[in-house]
A protein has these predicted regions:
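Acidic, proline/glycine-enriched N-terminal capping motif
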Residues: 1-91
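Short hydrophobic/aromatic-rich motifs at helix boundaries and adjacent loops
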Residues: 37-42, 95-97, 124-128
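Aromatic/His-enriched, Gly/Pro-containing loop or helix-boundary segments
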Residues: 85-104
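Acidic, low-complexity central loop/insert segments
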Residues: 99-147
């Protein structure tokens, strides 16, 4: 049985469609209304708030955290200010896209990365030889996305 997200108590009464799915072990709304049209136009013309708690979240910290981030994303992490967030693809050494998501700079040597798929092992492989810790904090960090 999927786990309710930390926002489930607020989102469940709004789900008129009763359409739920298992997203990475969490109970997630497929659509709130019986027709997707209202939601579609709300996002296109104004804004929408999504519960994205099921996204996988990783905390990278240590002297080489920025070096690890630069190894796996296509943007330059050295240009990120503390508090800044990038949306970026994650790529392997050949440029093949592994995933995409956000990277937030939390401090000089601290980052949080989010992804749709579980990539802890892949991040740990790329961290080999670096002085950086990589932790899966998915269950400790809830998330909302304003789009």
């Amino acid at each position: 049985m999927p786990t309710p997200s930390p926002f489930h108590e607020r989102t469940a009464p709004l789900c008129r469609s009763y359409a739920w799915k298992d997203w990475a072990g969490y109970c997630a709304v497929c659509s709130y209304d019986t027709s997707h049209e209202r939601e579609y136009f709300a996002f296109r013309e104004t804004a929408g708030l999504l519960d994205v708690s099921p996204l996988f979240k990783y905390h990278l910290h240590g002297p080489d955290a920025q070096m690890l981030v630069d190894r796996v994303i296509t943007r330059d992490a050295s240009k990120m200010a503390v508090g800044q967030v990038y949306y970026t693809p994650w790529c392997d050494d050949d440029g093949k896209v592994i995933d995409d998501g956000t990277v937030a700079r939390l401090g000089a040597d601290r980052f949080r990365m989010t992804a749709a798929d579980p990539n802890l092992r892949w991040l740990l492989e790329h961290a080999r030889g670096l002085n950086v810790a990589v932790e899966d904090v998915t269950e400790q960090v809830a998330a909302l996305a304003l789009q």
